Amino acid sequence: MSRQINTPDWILHANAPLRELNTFHIQAQARWLLEIIHPTALPQALTHPHIVGLPILVLGSGSNVLFAADPEECVLRFVNREVTILEHRIDHTLVRAGAGMAWHDLVLWSLQQGLSGLENLALIPGTVGACSIQNIGAYGVQVEEFVHIVEAYDQTEGKFVRLTASECEFAYRNSRFKREPNRYLITAVEFRLPLLHELNLNYAGISEELEALQITLPEPCDVAQAVINLRRRKLPDPEVLSNAGSFFKNPHLPREQAEQLRQHHPTLPIYPGETPESNKLSAAWLIEQCGWKGIREGDAGVAPQHSLVLVNYGEATGAELLALARRIAASVQERFGVAIEPETRLIGAQW
């Protein structure tokens, strides 16, 4: 970084390289990178002459973004990683975590405190701040089930706000924050975590993994370990093979259309959708049927372990990975008549 401006509450970097700040390890550079240590100083930092008026791009752990070009925005990172217990109740505990805390660290911390609810979401990359934007989910659980309050700076109103879970307007891999991307800067999230929680063991091999671990009466920490084992087998480690996890969302279709597809493709996995009239399809299955699993084109490719995961074998550019993703989606559309869309956020390009 060529130069930086330091204060006790925030640091502003000029011409900041972003390769180590995104898990695809794409070469990109931010004209300005603002790191927020204490979120209360956010209004002051945003009025600095170098960045005042610039659009803001919030970057958590960089685990759900693809830089197709250098960002034009001022890149903002929260580095507040504290977690505190706000209140104990008979059946639940309220917990507050800073936006910069790694999500998996929060899951492990909650289990160490004897709390439950987040165990199925173990090992998901990203930060606490990003979890509410994306409404992260895995193994039958979505984070919206446990979000109590989202604290954010409302850029439109110029003030800090506290939004309830209903005000966040959560949906499948979606939220108010995703639909209004330039309005809210999430600074912290409060979670309502139960003390006694019915474990969700009915999804994607968790029961089988617990059986392999010889656990007959599982506790939340056992479920978390099972999920960790499953994810490590299915998904490549970004520190070993650069990737951003699942690149595509599972498509949702009207139930009748999904059933018609299965008549032509009997092995097509179909899951319940968000409404009784809809179903969710496996994007991984659709992509694999089109022959993309394990494909490599230069340094851009599809992971051998999982067809939802695009990988950078070394020096692939964001534009090359995006071009590959578009070809994959086009082949699924042509063969099955189903549109698949990226779950990963695209920077410097439109889908």
UniProtKB/Swiss-Prot annotation:
GO biological process entries: cell division; cell wall organization; peptidoglycan biosynthetic process; regulation of cell shape
UniProt keyword annotation of Cell wall biogenesis/degradation present: yes
Biological function: Cell wall formation.
Cofactor: FAD
FAD-binding PCMH-type domain span: 25-196
Species whose genome carries this gene: Xylella fastidiosa (strain Temecula1 / ATCC 700964)
Assigned GO CC terms: cytosol
Cell compartment(s), UniProt: Cytoplasm
Family: Belongs to the MurB family.
Superkingdom of this protein's organism: Bacteria
InterPro entries documented for this protein: FAD-bd_PCMH, FAD-bd_PCMH-like_sf, FAD-bd_PCMH_sub1, FAD-bd_PCMH_sub2, MurB, MurB_C, MurB_C_sf, Oxid_FAD_bind_N
GO molecular function, one term: UDP-N-acetylmuramate dehydrogenase activity
Positions of the catalytic residues: 173, 246, 343
NCBIfam families with a match to the protein in the record: murB, PRK00046.1, PRK13903.1
Biological or metabolic pathway of the protein: Cell wall biogenesis; peptidoglycan biosynthesis
Gene name of the record: murB
Alphabetical UniProt keywords: Cell cycle, Cell division, Cell shape, Cell wall biogenesis/degradation, Cytoplasm, FAD, Flavoprotein, NADP, Oxidoreductase, Peptidoglycan synthesis
Enzyme class: oxidoreductase
Enzyme Commission code(s) on record: 1.3.1.98
Protein's UniProt name: UDP-N-acetylenolpyruvoylglucosamine reductase
Keyword Oxidoreductase on entry: yes
Catalytic activity of the protein: UDP-N-acetyl-alpha-D-muramate + NADP(+) = UDP-N-acetyl-3-O-(1-carboxyvinyl)-alpha-D-glucosamine + NADPH + H(+)
Predominant cellular place of this UniProt entry's protein: cytoplasm
